[in-house]
Amino acid sequence: MDINASLIVQMLVFVVFIGLTMKFIWPPLTKALEARRKNIADGLAAAEEGRKELELAEIKSKEQLTEAKTQAAHIIEQANQRANHIVEEAKNKAREEGAHLIQLAKNEIEQEYNAAKTELLKQISTIAVAGAQKILQREVDKASNDRLVDELVSEI
């Protein structure tokens, strides 16, 4: 094998090229690769953190939804109890008012009954006095007595 000067020059140029490449090109290239690796790692870490936050947010939202449903059920139960209480109060008030009105009606009926009874007694007294006057004005015999009683009965 013949080593000539051109092969040595080519080897020297290659070594110089490798040296220059290692000094000027390789460091920025490794920095760019390292920055890219770091950027990808940061992106993956951020994605993992985002996934964890999403899971926490889902858990929290489920808890809040469960709590909201519980509160809604409690509010509905309270509203139903209040409505039932109001209905019962209204029923009791209506019963009391009905009993009061019935008592007032009974009192009014009793007053009307007593007034009618008093009026009837006045009329009977008037008729009895009128009948007694007629009897005293006439001579009393059996036939006239019967006729007078019939007249009084027809007037009553």
Swiss-Prot record:
CC annotations in GO: plasma membrane; proton-transporting ATP synthase complex
Keyword Cell membrane: yes
Keywords from the UniProt entry: ATP synthesis, Cell inner membrane, Cell membrane, CF(0), Hydrogen ion transport, Ion transport, Membrane, Transmembrane, Transmembrane helix, Transport
TM region(s), chain numbering: 7-27
Keyword Coiled coil: no
InterPro entries membership: ATP_synth_B-like_membr_sf, ATP_synth_b/b'su_bac/chlpt, ATP_synth_F0_bsu_bac, ATP_synthase_B_chain
Main location: membrane
Gene3D superfamilies: F1F0 ATP synthase subunit B, membrane domain (1.20.5.620)
Location(s), subcellular: Cell inner membrane
GO molecular function: proton-transporting ATP synthase activity, rotational mechanism; proton-transporting ATPase activity, rotational mechanism
Pfam families associated with the record: ATP-synt_B
CDD domains per the UniProt record, alphabetical: ATP-synt_Fo_b (cd06503)
Topology versus the membrane: Single-pass membrane protein
Function: F(1)F(0) ATP synthase produces ATP from ADP in the presence of a proton or sodium gradient. F-type ATPases consist of two structural domains, F(1) containing the extramembraneous catalytic core and F(0) containing the membrane proton channel, linked together by a central stalk and a peripheral stalk. During catalysis, ATP synthesis in the catalytic domain of F(1) is coupled via a rotary mechanism of the central stalk subunits to proton translocation. Component of the F(0) channel, it forms part of the peripheral stalk, linking F(1) to F(0).
PANTHER family: ATP SYNTHASE SUBUNIT B (PTHR33445:SF1), ATP SYNTHASE SUBUNIT B', CHLOROPLASTIC (PTHR33445)
Subunit description: F-type ATPases have 2 components, F(1) - the catalytic core - and F(0) - the membrane proton channel. F(1) has five subunits: alpha(3), beta(3), gamma(1), delta(1), epsilon(1). F(0) has three main subunits: a(1), b(2) and c(10-14). The alpha and beta chains form an alternating ring which encloses part of the gamma chain. F(1) is attached to F(0) by a central stalk formed by the gamma and epsilon chains, while a peripheral stalk is formed by the delta and b chains.
Protein name per Swiss-Prot or TrEMBL: ATP synthase subunit b
Species whose genome carries this gene: Coxiella burnetii (strain Dugway 5J108-111)
Lineage: Bacteria, Pseudomonadati, Pseudomonadota, Gammaproteobacteria, Legionellales
